[in-house]
Amino acid sequence: MRLIDPDADLEFDPDSVYDGPSKSQKKREVEALQDLGNELVKLPDAQFKRIELPEELREAVAACRKITQNSALRRQRQYIGKLMRGIDPAPIQAQLDAFKGVSATENAKLHQAEKWRDRLIADNEALTIFLDSYPETDATRLRQLIRNARDEAARNKPPKAFREIFRVIREAMQAG
């Protein structure tokens, strides 16, 4: 048995010990790629057709979208993760982020249109404010729709004018 001499001058170089990322770090990276693959699987058809993917990955994602059995779905998602490790995920993530940004913007516009519709029906002065903001809107038609919507609400009729006001507001917001 060799004994270590405590008086010996041992040099410790911390750079020579580093073997790369830890096992846990590698697992986190693999899981992140699988999550990115899951986002691809959950994309609506129109967005999935527009996203640029390597052919093998596109086929694997398309197959995963058709699978309903849990164990097969899990295996296919792991396979997608394996394919993702062989490519650069940054462009795919950028495209997904762009889709999400568009969706968030569209949602915000729809919420704003809903708020305008509710304000217009509840408050007569809101019409003046709306027409100042969107002067190209047909004021006569909008006034008539507001009257009809109030009448429909009072009589518990289907909200036909209510929906039409929303369409008019959305068109005005897109034009302006």
Curated annotation (Swiss-Prot):
It is found in: Cytoplasm. GO terms for cellular component: cytosol. Transmembrane segments: none annotated. One of its GO terms (molecular function) is rRNA binding. Its main location: cytoplasm. It comes from the Bacteria. This is Dual-action ribosomal maturation protein DarP. It comes from Thiobacillus denitrificans (strain ATCC 25259 / T1).
